[in-house]
Amino acid sequence: MSCPPTPNPPFRPPSHTRVLRTPPLPPWVCLNSKSLSTGVGGQKNQLREASMENGERKKLSSTLSDGDHKEENKLKQGIPQDLSSSPKLDRYKIARQLTEKAIKERKIFSIYGHYPVIRATLRRKGWVEKKFNFFPKALQNLGSEDKSAETKENQEIALERFDDIHDVMSRLVKNEIPYLLWTIKRDVVDYHSLTCDQMLNHYGKTASFTTKIGLCLNMRSLPWYVQANPNTFFPRCYGLCTESEKQEFLDDFRRTVAASILKWVVLHQNYCSKVKGKSKKEEAKNSDPSPKKDPENPDLKLPSLSGQVVDTACKVCQAYLGQLEHEDIDVSEASTEALSEEEWNDLTQQYYLLVHGNASITDSKSYFAQCQALLSKISSVNPQTEIDGIRNIWIIKPAAKSRGRDIVCMDRVENILSLVAADSQTTKDNKWVVQKYIETPMLIYDTKFDIRQWFLVTDWNPLTIWFYKESYLRFSTQRFSLDKLDSAIHLCNNSIQRRLKNDKERSPLLPCHNMWTSTRFQEYLQKRGRGGTWGSIIYPSMKRAVTNAMRVAQDHVEARKNSFELYGADFILGRDFKPWLIEINSSPTMHPSTPVTAQLCAQVQEDTIKVVVDRKLDRNCDIGNFELLWRQPAVELPPFNGSDLCVEGISVKKAKKQMPPIASVGLSESLLDAPPKVRSARALMETVIRPPRTTVRQDWKREEAKVLSTTWSMPVMDAEVRGRAKPIYAFEVNDYQHVDNKSHKSGYTRVQSSKVPGVTLTSAQHPALFAQTMKPTQMTSSPPPTASGNHRDSSPFCPIVFEELWLHPNSQRRPSSCILQSRAQGWIRGIP
């Protein structure tokens, strides 16, 4: 909307009046660049009237200093060069032009979360932000770090300049559809309502590899998808909320106990051979067979274990080796000599004394060769033998939490099972997972570290993975030691370490912010003669681990075209520089907490935009430090056409069951022995004949109902007698048979006795029911028994034949009482 030139002359304040800098113009005010004039003292002042969209008018003035280029540079941010080079610009006119161009090119984006780098990168590329209407419900599910970042983001938005050109452009696109959504969680948006043109930085159903329990279960299925062994790059893991998983973990713990005893013997002898001639604890165990004394308490004798412990451990390891080499396939379970529960408990307790109680094994030197040979065979078939160590430490993690929350390390099986049992009654299944702790990690200056490696998935069919060339290391604040199982020593998560102070005994060569870039790490390896290790072992192994994890999870993810997601994988290096995959994180933190993350996190976000946005228009564009890791051939899905589906053949006709003739039901004798007392003949009929209440209801809108023909012997009384008398009647039931359907008649229900043609029972209550003329049936009526009361002895006692029953098509009411249900899909209804 254009505004006419202001007729008022430029305002010049008196010399003694200080020029005030008034607030900038709101976005709905139109400016006229012709009204700018040069004021006193080299300052530009203006006073104009501008029409607003709602009809209001305001008088605003703005003053710009000739030497103040900060505001001008801020204005030019995100503006093409051809527009920003002009000295006389209407910022709101530029905002409208840029907005119209962005709408035409579908460059509208929305951000939920603290992602200033993504916002600035998209703005430089001509994208316009539509302010995201976030949901408080989604904010409740965020962690404390996410909430603080979101609060900071909201404060930054609130403190923005009101006349910021990007804020103006955001108001202009408030009714437009964003074509790029960048959120901290997928549930923030309605995932299934997105159009195919909208990009989202998340996929659905990624819990199969972004949660600890999902990755644990998926890695077991890896051999079905890839010719690879998950035990070569993923430490074995178990869920602790199912009995089968608990038993598998218990068996693994016990096997590790046996292998640790053998390792103790080998390590003890190797250590003794290096310290010959020195008075050491391990040397004295073999030189002096007598029980050793504690150096801190000489009067306390340390326990000494017999060689039977080593024999039992060798027996267990030999059986385990046979399982790994598949020698137990043709052997029955009854023939195997497994340890009893009591023997397992005894072996475990002796192991605790050996490792934690500083006990020794008598004559352990004689078992050295046997233990070394057996361990060598196990190592050749079990790639995790080296990382197991001798302490048998396991790390217990919540199944679906992140940032190191509630993670503990334990080395006693009873403590692990007790932790799960105490929490199993109030939690869902698979809340806890237990994973073998890497007891022999690579250390830098006696300090443990892990590696955060990014990778990007842009499609699941075909699976397309981009691997980032840069990564960073996270150090612990404490020196590494297995004597203490504190999280500060064994967990390198920045969310945990940032709350702790660096240990004074830690090497001063480590950075105070506890992070290195991968480039700095390569320099460290180069100085120690291991410069080629990164390119030959570490980097390729991390690539293979990520590729295998994504290929096995491909069938579980809810794939969506035009979506992408950036993940963060955590690795720990062993002593042999082999990386071990620990977990994969969705929505990895991009908070610039250290100088390292401030550099790399901003860099990886900018490069992500290059891959997912720029590469759509130019396949040869710059993609930063990303490299294509894996792209499989696309799997063509067969088209679905329901019209081609048909079934040919002849249907099987179900044979009709023939109704056998039913003989006379002898109810007369039983009724005569104990005749019921009823008020009327109708009540008598309903009491004796009607089916149970659970009978399936018949569809009363059918055009006709097939019924049975039967004969009932009953007295016919006058109306005055039926209302008040309480006689006892005999009721005779005779043979009945199927009758063919007759022609349809309309009228009232009419039932007439063949022997008493003058007596007619008419139901005016149900006019839709009617019957044909009854056929007489030859039979002998049973006389009623003598009874006291007002019963008339002269009452006629004659049979009434119910021949056929018809149902009117327009009938909306059903008869009152059901007398008999036939097997020929028909009903006989009583007379009310």
UniProtKB/Swiss-Prot annotation:
Cellular compartments per GO CC: axoneme; cilium; microtubule; microtubule cytoskeleton; sperm flagellum
PROSITE patterns: TTL
GO biological process, one term: protein polyglycylation
Tissue specificity: Highly expressed in testis. Expressed in brain, heart, kidney, liver, lung, muscle, spleen and trachea. Expressed in sperm flagellum. In the brain, specifically expressed in ependymal cilia.
Listed result of changing residue 205 to E: Decreased monoglycylation activity
Phenotype upon changing residue 106 to E: Decreased monoglycylation activity
Reported effect, residue 224 to A: Decreased monoglycylation activity
Residues annotated for Mg(2+) 1 binding in this entry: 570, 583
PANTHER family hit by this protein: PROTEIN MONOGLYCYLASE TTLL8, TUBULIN MONOGLYCYLASE TTLL3
Protein name from the UniProt record: Protein monoglycylase TTLL8
Naturally occurring in which organism (per UniProt): Mus musculus (Mouse)
Taxonomic lineage of the native organism: Eukaryota, Metazoa, Chordata, Craniata, Vertebrata
Protein encoded by which gene: Ttll8
